[in-house]
């Protein structure tokens, strides 16, 4: 069973539907016992980092997620991926879950072309930087769907794939041990995204 963490942030049903379309058992939950019983965990998320972290804290699931990430595959998606890092500088400084070394910063900090929209939204190709079982059904350069204006940086050792936006190589996919993350939305990325979710289900 794949547990989808419900903490009031994220498009849970779209993700659940994508997993079920693959014939996978998925459960939306905020019960610690269900996260412990799961074979894999997905941490979704949309919105602002600080607000999401507070909501996650309110569920009491932070220590459970940190503990289970040592024993089973965990996938953070979009803001869920950003929460995996040490800290974020989105509207202040906020602590992350500390599962992947690195930080989350505003794209504007690093974009040299100030005419580009700060919101990186739409389809972009993902360049595979490091081979990984997560990409066993994924081809280098396939297009995936992004919606974000903050991105993970100072995390070179964990990067699996990047997408170019202006002069910035946006961190698109990461891994640190059992902990994976995608800045893009696999559940919104068509067949390529479904194949990536299938690969995650087999890790």
PLM segments and residue spans:
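N-terminal beta1-alpha1 ligand-phosphate binding loop
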Residues: 2-24, 186-188
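Short gly/ser/thr-rich secondary-structure transition/capping motifs
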Residues: 21-28, 56-59, 125-129, 163-165
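Short acidic low-complexity segments
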Residues: 26-37
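Structural alpha-helical scaffold elements that stabilize or flank donor/cofactor-binding regions
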Residues: 34-35, 68, 173
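Short acidic/histidine-rich motifs immediately flanking catalytic phosphotransfer sites
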Residues: 36-45
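Cysteine-nucleophile active-site neighborhood
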Residues: 49-120
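Amide-donor transfer/coupling interface in amidating biosynthetic enzymes
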Residues: 102-203
């Amino acid at each position: 069973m794949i547990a989808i963490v419900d903490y009031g942030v994220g498009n849970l049903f779209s993700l659940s539907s994508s997993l079920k379309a693959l014939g996978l058992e998925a459960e939306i939950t905020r019960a610690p016992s269900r996260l412990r019983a799961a074979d894999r965990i997905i941490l979704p998320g949309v919105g602002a980092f600080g607000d999401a972290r507070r909501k996650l804290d309110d569920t009491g699931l932070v220590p459970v997620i940190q503990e289970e990430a040592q024993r089973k595959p965990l996938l953070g998606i979009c803001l869920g991926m950003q929460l995996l890092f040490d800290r974020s500088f989105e509207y202040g400084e906020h602590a992350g879950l500390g599962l992947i070394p690195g930080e989350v910063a505003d794209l504007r900090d690093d974009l040299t072309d100030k005419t580009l929209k700060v919101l990186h939204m739409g389809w972009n190709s993902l360049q595979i930087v490091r081979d990984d079982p997560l990409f066993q059904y994924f081809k280098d350069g396939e297009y995936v769907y992004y919606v974000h204006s903050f991105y993970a940086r100072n995390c070179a050792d964990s990067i699996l794939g990047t997408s170019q936006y202006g002069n910035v190589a946006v961190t698109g996919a990461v891994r640190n041990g059992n902990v994976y993350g995608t800045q893009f939305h696999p559940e919104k990325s068509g067949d390529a995204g479904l194949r990536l979710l299938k690969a995650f289900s087999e890790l």
